[in-house]
Structures are given as C-alpha cells and as structure tokens.
C-alpha cells in the first residue's frame, strides 16, 4: 500500500517509458558466496518426511538451473524484493531463462513482471503483427508499431525496464526442440493441440521444463501449470519458521510442553520442530526434528517418551522445521480429462470452474473449425460455441457439467477475442509469480488449473449488438466487450489517483490503456509528495535510473501519457490531508467521479476515506504486502466504508523488555534504532534548538520541570561538555566508551541488581522465560565486528560535530591501534540503580523531588558551555536513511543490535536482515502489485457503469505464495433507524439558508429529536445544561463558529459542519449524521 511524492520532470520524461540504462548507474553488489543463507537451505538440512532428502532437492534445482554462485544482487535496487524472496531465490532467478510466447497484453504483463524480478533472460516469441486492437491491453505498443512483429516491437521497451536481464525476440514458428534452452516456457496465445505437444516435450525433458499455459478472453481467464513429474517445493508459504519460548516440559510418554504466554503459538498438528537451549532435559537439544500434536495457543504435545530424560530446569526455544514438499504434476494431455481439484477464488461461484474448463476447450474447438474467434455480439457464433460445449460435455463422463449455463457461455463468446487490460494485469501477476516458483522452488505452485471470471463487470443494462462493432479505435478490444457507449463513460470519467508509487504506476498504466479520462470531458489528477529513489526501480516500472531524485507524480504522469497520448492527466506534488484542503477543496471533490487509492499508510487511507464519505464518492482501495494483496470497493450507500473495520494494532514489546530484557532480535533492533536516533539525531537537534534560542529554550525546560526535561538537559551537557569531540580520536574514544557502557557496564549493573538466582516478590525465579540472563562482552580489536562497529559509530559521531574523517579509518590495523589507545575506566556497580521491570511502564526516566533544582544546575552548566563555543557552532543531526549502504547508518544499527544479541545469547543477523527489520521495510514485489491493480480496475468498470447492486462488487484477499484467492461481496453499511427515517454513515443532513441556533434546534425537533449538544471541531457551540448558551439562540451558527470556535472559513468553503448529539422522545441517544450548515 503505497503513498509517495513528486516535482517537475525534465525533457527526458517525454520518453520515460522507452529508454533507460540501469547498467550506467553505480551499483553496490554483494556476491552470493558471501551470504546465501536463504530459509530454504536451512530447512533442507534436516531432510524431509516425504521420502526424499534435502540434498537431492538442492541437486535437482541446481541441475535444472545451473550453478550461478558468481551472480550478484544489487541490494539497493532489489531490497524490497529481497525481503520477500531471500538471496537464494534471487540467485536461482538470476540463472533462469524464460520463454514467453504470445505478446498481446497478457504476454507483455508477464514479461514486465519477470524482467523487473531479474531473471537471467526473457525471450519474447510471436509470429503475428501489432494491430490497433492490441493497444487496449499492451502498454509497450504505440500506434507507430502497428504492422510490426509483436515480439520485435516489444523487445527494446521491455529491455529498458532492467538492463541486467537479456531480452530478445523470436519470430519464427516454434518447434519442440526450441524449448530445450529454457527453464520455463509460458504460452499465452496457443492452440490446445500445440500446447499438448509442447507440454509433452517439456514434461518428459530431463530435467523437466516448467510449462505454463495462460489465457485471458474478455472477462474470463485461465492458467494451467505443469512443472514436471516431480517438482520440489522448498518453501511452501514463504513465512518465517514459527518459534516459541518454553516454560515447562513434562517427563512422560507424549510429553506435554507449555510455552510462555508472550505470544500465541502458530504450530499445527503434525509439524516438525527442533529444540535448543533447553536446560535439564538436554536430550532435546540434539537438533533432531520431532513431531508435535495437540497444538494449542500456548502448549502442545511432543510425540515422544521423555520419561527417562533429564528433568526440565529452565529455558529452551522450540522452532518449526519447514518441510519441502514434492508435487507430481500431470501433463496437460491427462489433466484435461482428469483436472483434479480446481483452485477456487469465489465461493459464490462454486460451480463455475468446471464450466469454464469446458468453455475454454469449446473455444479452442471453435477456433480450429472457424479459423477465427467468435464475433462480438454475434448470436450465431455464440450458439455455435454453446453447441460445441454441449457436445464436449456429453462425452466427459464424471466431469460432466450438470447445468451448462448458456447465458454465461454467450458472454464468453461475445468477448472471446478481446484481451482486456485489467485481466491481463491480474493474470500477468499470477503467471509471473508461477514462473518465479518454477525457477526457484519458492512458494507453492498453482496445482494445476485456475479459472476466473468477472462477468459482473459487464454493463448492468443490456447492450445492443451493434454497439460492440469496432470503431477503428485503440479501444476496440474493450468496446467488443462493453460497447462504445460504455467506452464513452470511461473516457469522460474524472478520477483522483492518490499516490504514484508501485500501485500508482500500475494504475496509471491500466487507466491509460483502458481510456479512462482520455475523452474531452475526462480528467485524471494524480498527486504524490515523494521523490524517486533507486529502490523504487524494481517495482515502480514507469521510472528509470535518470529519474532518481525527481518527483514521482510528474514522472509517472509523463510516462503514462506516452502509453496513451490522449490521457488527460494532471500531476500534483501535494500530500492529501487536512493541511491541503485549500488545494483539494469542495469543488475539487464534488467534481470527481471516483477516487483510486495507491497509498502505503493507514492514516492517509482513513483521511481519503473520510473525504469520500463526506462527498459521497466511490473509493477503490488496495494494498500489498509481499506476496499478499487486498482490494476493497467502497461504494456510496451500498457498502461500508474503509474505516468501518480496522486491523487490530500490532503488538508492541514492553519498554522494559526492549531496554533490559530482550529475548529476540526484533527487540534488539528496536532498541538499536532508538539509540541511534537518540544519540545522532535527537540530541544534536536539541543542542541546536538551545543554541538558536537559549532563553526561550531554557524557559520552556524550567516550565516543564519534569524528568524528561532533566534527561534532555543532561544529554545536552554531555554533548557540549563531558563528551564534546574536537578531533576524530575524541570520536573514537567516545565510541569505544559507548561500547563499554552498552555491552559491558550496563549488563554488569543489571546482573548486579538482579543476580542469576534472584527471585521475584512471589518467590519465583526472576530470570524465568521469556527473560534471558545476559553476559557482558569483552572488547577485542581482533574481533572485526566489534572494531567495525566502533569505527562506524565514531565516523557518525564525527559527522555530527563536523570533524573530518581521516584516511587511516579504512585501515583496520591503524583503526585497531587507535581504539586500543583508549583508556577505559573500571566499572563500579551502583547500589541505588533503578531498573524498570514493570511491563506497563511507558518511560525509563523516573521523576524526583529534586528535578527542579537539578534542572536549574543543568541550565547553568549549558549556559557556561555556550560561552565556550564559537557563536556559529552547530551540530549536524543525522536522520536515519536505510537505503544508502555507504552512510554507515546500518553498520551502526546492525552493530548495536548484534552486540546486544550477543549479550543475551540471541542469534545475530546480517546487515540486510537488520535493514529489513530496523528500517521497517515493507516487502514488495511487482507480481502482487499488478494483480491488485487488475482486480481494482475490474471493479472500476462496475463503478463507472453506476447501475450495479452490491452483489456485483467484490472485495479480494489473495496470497500468491500459497496460492490463495478469496473474493467476497462487500458488507453493507450499518443502518440507523428513527421513526420513519433511516440513515447510514454515507448520509449527511444539509440545512441551507444560514440558520440561527434556534432554527437548527427547531429543525431537529421537527424530526422528533432533541439536541442537547452541538459542537464544531473540538469546541462546544451549544449545551442544553449551560444557561448562558441560551443567550446564543438567535445567533447564526456560522457566527458562533467564528466567534466561539475561532473557525476560519476561507472563500472556497460555503458550508460549516457540526456534530449534534440528540435524544429521542424516550431519552435514548440517537446517532445522527453529520449536519452541514450552508451559509453561502
């Protein structure tokens, strides 16, 4: 879910979609041999319960895809994708050659997603030439390409997406042997006879060649996958192995194991787990996978007799062992007759997949007999296809469809020739992900047929057959499904797209191809206040490397206008929020047809949702997280709004856990980022705030007079007096002493205050799970991780003071000698040290009766420090930037976290994994983004039609890793009833004529409602309990708002909104809609 930003594009942007040289940009690359520890490799170490060994699985993959240990990953470019796939999967992608045959819209979408993902090569095959018809769905074609070979016309524009991928074309007729050089072949425009021939070859090839057949025909789509007789899935879901912290283990046959109630267990019956760090019952620490059963939220049973094992004392971690899975694919020849279980997407269409299995076969027979597709609107062709389907169905035996839905087949026939952009985008995401699975063994493949339709997207009213006729237009394919009149609705739509990141780029491409806002009355406004970064380029495909640093919205708008020059698009660089309501004013919102969100944060979504509620505008919402995506249709008066239901807030670790009792690497990284920001950003910023306005700053601190003010002043004194740095050696000394404080002294103090045998007030062991007893570290310059951390920390400290970095810091020997010169004082434990152990505590700073006096002393000290500084002295606060590997930020944060993890015997992580967690990187890939936008645009057809009932709309949740597709009808809004009236959150009561307070109260009384409170914003305009408020009865409400609430009403605002609290005749509260009082 992505919300991003923008500025002016330069002249290059006129050709943004067609030209790039990613190879020209300087890249930091990491060799796979340095660290290729993917989850799949560790999973396989323990073997499999399915009768094959991990080593053989790896050999199978490596034999199929070759050895590519020399391949490198550009972490800056692929960081979001790495968070989904891991290094090993990326390595296998880099070694994979893919053939895509059929370069209409679906082929182009599949190719785009795979080129962005970074496979080794993509070969585009097509024997046909570009027609104007193709421009409805293929974003790489322009009108100038009409008459050229489709593959040749696609190569350069797709190559520009990623110059690290070799993109080539093939225009001859394929034979089976041509497929031997590929790991995966995808056919999107092929007869069933040829598909069976090619699939037989791929299925029997050694090693097998993964075969994918995909079709989109109008509003219908299908996918078939055959990855060979035995295909190893190394990681079925892509989720991290689940873990638990052990609290007790019984000595009995079928041992009962309980875990701490810190987090619910996610184990399932039959899972294999391994144990570590168990004290007492050490027999379990042998690394052997063990089967569990009777899983509950905080306990499970071990399928093993522990009667004669040692008695459990304490500690222990239990970790799920993810098992490989072997799939036996059937070749297409057999699967057509025995398809097995279909993958469902919409359980309101439970009988649909068998019918579509029949329909696609019937279409193939029709094309073979007629040499063409059925003509849109032709009843004769539709009846012929229905007859063929009926005949096939008669001979299907157990597969026979009980009720051949002729109406559905008629729709299928009418749109069979058309490849629609939303369907191409959706299936391009699905098929692209299946190719990644075939290349890598990562995630569970689609097994084996998937059928989908969105027949609900068709116009709600019947369309005359003449309206389907081609107009010699780039939209003819879409017209053949929806009709020319509906196409006019699309072209005249006024759309607001909020965000132009990954989702936004896909939306703009889709809308341009569909012709949305491309008519004389249409307009699309896109806004985004973000700029383009290198990490965007692997998903946000409208951007090129030369656009880095430019405004997202303007670059995206320029690129979308290249796709369709008729696109009426305006790009803005404003954040959408209360502060920009002068830009996005009432007139702007009232003029809109629909709003399409492409945001990446909940608060922005909620604001846009509130605006759509207020102005009663449809909102199409979507979001992605790795392989997962969701879409929601918010339709005035038909569905609930986005804010009507929310996910529960993420569980936050208690402050005391993060600061003193961490038990996982997330706690360590949370602490590390907090310390980084406190030391290098917040404290220097406080120093500058003080130096800029000493009197005002110290007055505010004295006024606060609390523990937080005391703590802030202490940090300023440390910066300007005790720990002030003037040379780089000072910075190195500071960093070395900071290491000693964090990882030695604080730990010694902690275990002095709470020894290993300490007990709680109830007599229970203090150091019981999930607490882990820490050990202080001992510094040694021979440990490169310690030396690198201290050097990186010193460099950033020097940056805050503007101190030059000497060249010798790059020499480990010289740096070690400089660190060794630092004199480290001996540690003396404090008897009165207070360490917070209360999990409900919200601060680590404790108040004292002496705070005011201490603050006075500190102010005197910093005043003295100020006089010792030059007048222009300022520090340089450092804002954390995760995506620049040369700035030492992640070196410091990863170092802080790993040293702390070492204190508590928590497994450490590499810098990349640390960046994912500490940088709060949202995992993202092109495939799920493409699918989400395709689904949203299928809903857009319904919105712009305007006549659909709620039953026609769909909200979707999908997970391409499993794969899982779950579609459901949106929930209706909650209805409130009073007397003969009813309303929902979509309603707003309007009162015109600039009424007085008395007139408003009377107006409500006429509805049987007694208003006891009226407020505007946070200010109370009227309360029936306050006698003086009765003096306001004859004042205009708008004047009360100006005088009492100090509301400023700009010229573009013609009404005022007030919240009214009411009771009915029985004194029951009644929630009424927002009341809008018009005064102009």
Curated annotation (Swiss-Prot):
Q: Which reaction does it catalyse?
A: ATP + ubiquitin + [E1 ubiquitin-activating enzyme]-L-cysteine = AMP + diphosphate + S-ubiquitinyl-[E1 ubiquitin-activating enzyme]-L-cysteine
Where are the compositionally biased (Low complexity) regions? Answer: 38-49
Listed SMART domains: UBA_e1_C
Q: List the active site.
A: 656
Q: Looking at its record, which EC class is this enzyme?
A: ligase
Binding positions for ATP per the UniProt entry: 502, 528, 539, 552, 600-601
Pathway it works in: Protein modification; protein ubiquitination
Ligase is among the record's keywords: yes
Keywords for the protein's UniProt record, in alphabetical order: ATP-binding, Ligase, Nucleotide-binding, Ubl conjugation pathway
Q: Under which EC number(s) is this enzyme classified?
A: 6.2.1.45
Membership in a protein family: Belongs to the ubiquitin-activating E1 family.
Task: State the oligomer form and interacting partners.
Answer: Monomer.
Task: State the name under which the record lists this protein.
Answer: Ubiquitin-activating enzyme E1 1
Q: Which organism is it from?
A: Arabidopsis thaliana
Q: Which gene encodes it?
A: UBA1
